Each structure stands twice: as structure tokens, then as C-alpha cells.
């Protein structure tokens, strides 16, 4: 017979299972105690098997279960003749049976409980049935005055009883969790804050156009703005910032990104927006612009895009532009007229474009890089930047 080992993950162990229905069972237990004092214990009969019984007792006046204690001062039989035997006896019971646990102890001369012994489980009692300990305590130990168990020749027995009563079941159906957490509206709320200029504390001027903003938000989103407001510069003292080399519409789109993390018009101004993102250290916006430019590379614009990527250290875009040039050059040498491979609507060679000719004069190092890459090109698949966009 083979056993199949299964592994339970820590996550499965930490989260409790959920059931469609459930039941809670309450087992009622009645607890009570009884004390029995046997005076002049040393005069008790010494014959093995002889019995002393206490009066009957119960948990209360309305309890129909009656109990008593039974003692064999010199043991129940020959095996236990050197011991005192002690039992709990069910005297009367209206039921067929009852289950109970019990604990016996002696009270010493200081009225302290000692020599405690208890049942390990709830035993089944029927009327006239008893349970207990045949060898409860050795007689010589009990009779030794030094042990203080028979003060004034009195044996005091203390009994605690726990009777199991009827159980009660409470059941029901689990209600499914119908709570629906609303979608996060942080971007919309921040956009509303930006559009409505509420609680603004600084002004940004772009070609004479004023933009109201919040310094804390600008500082949290842009390391450049953070340094600007943190240090005792003119912008920090007067809460007025003059933005240069950025078109107002481009700046507005950049501010929308700062507040909301989105830029719906990136494809219309990706080149200028990339420059602004680089200037204000908005890394995620910069990669978004790289992605847009990469998706829209053409034979006519690839040289300009390569220059832009080099100028603003957009390394992913730069690599993609060089790959594009290499691919189109290789396909051109093979006589391929599949315009889709070059993402172009013209068959004009890249090196004949005005952008390429301008790059030869203004950025000859890029031409050299393109040719070096072409010489060792393995024609890798063309795709969008591989760098994952960071969450705003």
C-alpha cells in the first residue's frame, strides 16, 4: 500500500476554508463538588473489601441525578489491601446512562488539596455503577502523622464532578461577501485637483501662460522640482517658477502626467514631451514617449529620432532606431520591397533623406554608430522598448 505525499503551502494553511453551511455544537457540562469528612478514621473496620458510603449528593435541588462516594479503608481486594480505594457511585439516574469526569483529593491539616487524582476521560455511568481508583493512596502513608493527612483523626475527601448534559446544535448558511470595493479614483481625483486649481501654492509661467500647481505634488513626482523648492532659490521664496524651452501645450501634458500618471496625447507630441520628461527627471513619462516614438518610426523620421534619443540619453529608443536603420538597409540590399518591414510608405533610401544628411553634418558620431552596428548586425526582431514602465 502506497501513500501519496501532498504539500500544503503556507498561504493555504494561514487562510481558513470557507464553507457554504456551518454548525456550532455546544456541549453542556454541569460542574459541582462535594466534601466528605470521616471522623475517627483510625477506628474504621480493617477488613479488606468492607465499604463506607457517603450520603447522596447532586448538583442542586432540581437535579435528579444522585451520587455518593464509596471508600474501602483497607482496599477493595487482596491486590489493593495496602491501599485506600475510592470510588464515585451513581445512586439514581432517570436516564439510561450518563457520562461524567471526576477528580478526588485529600485535605491536609492546612486545608490544602493534596494527592489529587482525576479521570482521564468522561466515563459512562449507569445506575448502580461506580468508577474510581482501587489504589488511591497507601494506608501507611495516610496513617503516618508526619504527613498531616488525618488531623484530629479526620479523613476529609474532596470530589469534583463534571457531568455531560445534552448538546445543542446551532446551524446556518454562510452569507456570501457581496461587498464591492469601489475602483480607485486617485488619478481622476488628482486630475480634478489640477484642473480646478484648488489649494494651489505656486505658479509656473510658460511663455507668459500661468499654471497653478501644488509644490508638494511637484516635489513628490519630480526630483528637479523637489530640489528647486527645497533649496533657498528664488522660485522657493516667491513661489513663482519660470519655465523655459518648453511649449505651453507640452508643459500642460507633462503636468497632467505629474498629477494623474497618464498622458492621453503622447503620440501627438512624443518628441517634445520626451525632452520635457528628461529635463524634469520623469523617468516613466520618458519611457512612454520612447515607446510612442518607437511605434511610429519611419524612413523619413528615423534620423531625427536617433538624434533626439542621443540628445536626451534615451538609450532604448536609440537602440531601436539603429536597429530600424540596419533592418531597412539589409532589406534594401536584398531588393526587398516589403514596406511593412520598414514601417514606411515610401521606397526612398534612409540615406537620401534630409534628416540623414543633416545628421552627417551635425552628429557624425551617430552615423559612425549606425554603420558599426550595421557591420555586426544580426537583424534582431524589431519591437518596442523592452524596459518595463514603472507605475506612477
UniProtKB/Swiss-Prot annotation:
GO terms (BP aspect): negative regulation of protein ubiquitination; proteasome-mediated ubiquitin-dependent protein catabolic process; protein ubiquitination; regulation of proteolysis
Pfam families: BTB (PF00651), MATH_2 (PF22486)
GO cellular component, one term: Cul3-RING ubiquitin ligase complex
Residues spanning the signal sequence: none
Subcellular location: Nucleus
Subunit structure: Homodimer. Heterodimer with SPOP. Component of cullin-RING-based BCR (BTB-CUL3-RBX1) E3 ubiquitin-protein ligase complexes containing homodimeric SPOPL or the heterodimer formed by SPOP and SPOPL.
Protein name, as recorded: Speckle-type POZ protein-like
Amino acid at each position: 500500500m502506497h501513500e501519496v505525499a501532498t504539500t500544503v503551502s503556507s498561504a493555504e494553511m494561514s487562510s481558513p476554508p470557507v464553507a457554504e453551511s456551518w454548525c456550532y455544537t455546544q456541549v453542556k457540562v454541569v460542574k459541582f463538588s462535594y466534601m466528605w469528612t470521616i471522623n475517627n478514621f483510625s477506628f474504621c473496620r480493617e477488613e479488606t473489601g468492607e465499604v463506607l458510603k457517603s450520603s447522596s449528593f447532586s448538583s442542586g435541588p432540581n437535579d435528579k441525578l444522585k451520587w455518593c462516594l464509596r471508600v474501602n479503608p483497607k482496599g477493595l481486594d487482596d491486590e489493593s489491601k495496602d491501599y485506600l480505594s475510592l470510588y464515585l457511585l451513581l445512586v439514581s439516574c432517570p436516564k439510561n446512562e450518563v457520562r461524567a469526569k471526576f477528580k478526588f483529593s485529600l485535605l491536609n491539616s492546612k486545608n490544602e488539596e493534596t494527592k489529587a487524582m482525576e479521570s482521564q476521560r468522561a466515563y459512562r455511568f449507569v445506575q448502580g455503577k461506580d468508577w474510581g481508583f482501587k489504589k488511591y493512596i497507601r494506608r501507611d502513608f495516610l496513617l503516618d502523622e508526619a504527613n498531616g493527612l488525618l488531623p484530629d483523626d479526620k479523613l476529609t475527601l474532596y470530589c469534583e464532578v463534571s457531568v455531560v448534559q445534552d448538546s445543542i446544535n446551532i446551524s446556518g448558511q454562510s452569507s456570501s461577501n457581496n461587498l464591492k470595493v469601489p475602483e480607485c479614483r486617485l488619478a481622476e481625483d488628482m486630475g480634478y485637483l489640477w484642473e480646478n486649481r484648488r489649494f494651489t501654492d505656486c505658479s509656473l509661467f510658460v511663455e507668459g501662460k500661468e499654471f497653478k500647481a501644488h509644490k508638494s505634488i511637484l516635489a513628490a513626482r519630480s526630483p528637479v522640482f523637489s530640489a528647486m523648492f527645497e533649496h533657498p532659490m528664488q522660485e522657493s521664496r516667491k513661489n513663482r517658477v519660470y519655465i523655459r524651452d518648453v511649449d505651453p501645450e507640452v508643459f500642460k501634458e507633462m503636468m497632467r502626467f505629474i498629477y494623474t500618471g497618464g498622458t492621453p496625447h503622447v503620440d501627438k507630441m512624443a518628441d517634445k514631451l520626451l525632452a520635457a520628461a528628461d529635463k524634469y527627471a520623469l523617468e516613466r513619462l520618458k519611457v512612454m514617449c520612447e515607446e510612442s516614438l518607437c511605434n511610429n518610426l519611419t524612413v523619413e523620421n528615423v534620423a531625427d529620432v536617433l538624434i533626439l534619443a542621443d540628445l536626451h540619453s534615451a538609450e532604448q529608443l536609440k537602440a531601436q532606431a539603429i536597429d530600424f536603420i540596419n533592418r531597412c538597409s539589409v532589406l534594401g540590399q536584398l531588393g526587398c520591397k516589403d514596406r511593412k518591414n520598414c514601417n514606411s510608405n515610401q521606397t526612398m533610401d534612409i540615406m537620401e533623406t534630409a534628416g540623414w544628411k543633416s545628421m552627417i553634418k551635425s552628429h557624425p558620431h551617430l552615423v559612425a554608430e549606425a554603420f558599426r552596428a550595421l557591420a555586426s548586425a544580426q537583424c534582431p526582431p524589431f519591437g518596442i522598448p523592452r524596459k518595463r514602465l514603472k507605475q506612477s
